Regions:
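Long, polar low-complexity repeats
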Residues: 1-175
Length: 175
């Protein structure tokens, strides 16, 4: 499909979904069937297109099994910042750059979260799974908290919404 003005992309795979050796600049929403999962492998850079949107929303389980070494354009034979897709404001036409291998921003998973290898998430993981195995940590992954996600959370992730009453806009009906 085409591009979305807000950088939001919804995927409904028929099975599990594997993401590897890629840069995703947007909000990826993955809706999985029962017993399926998203696996993030190898080296990736996933970051939101809009700072006020989450990075990943996964309805199902997620396994972050990637390496925090740099994502290399040379090794992947791919240009990850072509014209129209800048990284830190820069584009080019040659596959010679490298980028941090990490997920940046808010990650929301409704099922079980597993973090392995040297996976790095720079942000917040909202794990909505239940039970003792809702979050599994193996090897030496990193979760680097980003305080701004608490003080200025992405849309729809607020703690509360205050709705002040405006004078003259309500009344109590008589019994």
């Amino acid at each position: 499909g085409g591009t979305n003005a807000d950088g939001v992309y919804i995927v409904r795979p028929s099975g599990s979904l594997s993401i590897k050796t890629s840069r995703i600049h947007g909000t990826l929403v993955v809706i999985l069937g029962a017993g399926k999962r998203v696996q993030v492998n190898d080296r990736v850079l996933i970051h939101p297109y809009r700072a006020d949107y989450p990075t990943l929303i996964i309805k199902g389980d997620a396994e972050f099994n990637f390496i925090s070494d740099n994502l290399s354009e040379t090794l992947a034979l791919t240009n990850f910042n072509p014209p129209g897709a800048p990284y830190n404001g820069v584009t080019d036409i040659l596959p010679l750059g490298s980028y941090p291998s990490e997920i940046q921003g808010l990650v929301h998973v409704t099922g079980i979260v597993t973090m392995k290898q040297t996976s790095r998430i720079r942000g917040v993981v909202l794990a909505a799974g239940t039970g003792a195995d809702a979050i599994n940590i193996e090897d030496t992954p990193e979760l680097i908290y980003t305080p701004s996600l608490f003080t200025a959370p992405p849309q729809w992730y607020t703690k509360e919404v205050r709705m002040p009453i405006q004078l003259g806009t309500w009344s109590q009906p008589a019994n």
